[in-house]
Regions:
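PP2C/PPM-type serine/threonine phosphatase catalytic domain
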Residues: 1-158
Length: 158
């Protein structure tokens, strides 16, 4: 479920497609990237979430939206707000525990908000040059190198 990789800079892009077999999209996406700067330099951060709903039109859409909301709120409260406020140091934050809790929060929210629905989810949290991933299901994370090489960073859960 979790993996850490060091990065020096990143570019973010996204696209959505319903494909050729469906008439609607059940995905939800959250992108937040920022930089705090002071006399000591900049501190980059980012939170990126993709959830792929399943279970039919309404249930899948509701499940993916609920999961994205729950994960983003959980990570902002436990990690990003203290990081931005500089009230705790990065080394004091248990990123793995925070990510795991956010996924559990998403599960609870989906059960409550989207009966009959479900979702896969991939979350990437970037603090300084460290990226921490958490995922459930077959939503994937890739590293695309400057040379165009592609490395899978996650392994699908079945």
């Amino acid at each position: 479920m979790k993996k850490q990789t060091a990065i020096t800079n990143y570019h973010v892009a996204f696209a959505q497609s319903i494909g050729k077999q469906r008439d609607h999209n059940e995905d939800s996406i959250f992108i937040n990237s920022g930089l705090t700067c002071d006399h000591t330099g900049g501190k980059p951060f980012g939170l990126f979430i993709v959830a792929d709903g399943m279970g039919g039109y309404v249930a899948g859409e509701a499940a993916s939206a609920a999961a994205v909301r729950a994960v983003s709120v959980s990570i902002f409260r436990s990690v990003l707000v203290p990081y931005i406020k500089d009230t705790i140091k990065e080394s004091q934050i248990s990123l793995h525990e925070a990510m795991e809790k956010s996924i559990k929060d998403a599960q609870s929210e989906v059960i409550t908000s989207a009966p009959g629905g479900g979702t896969t989810i991939i979350t990437a949290l970037i603090l300084n040059s460290q990226v921490t991933l958490a995922h459930i299901g077959d939503s994937r994370a890739y590293f695309i190198g400057h040379d165009g090489s592609i490395v899978y960073l996650t392994k699908d859960h079945s």
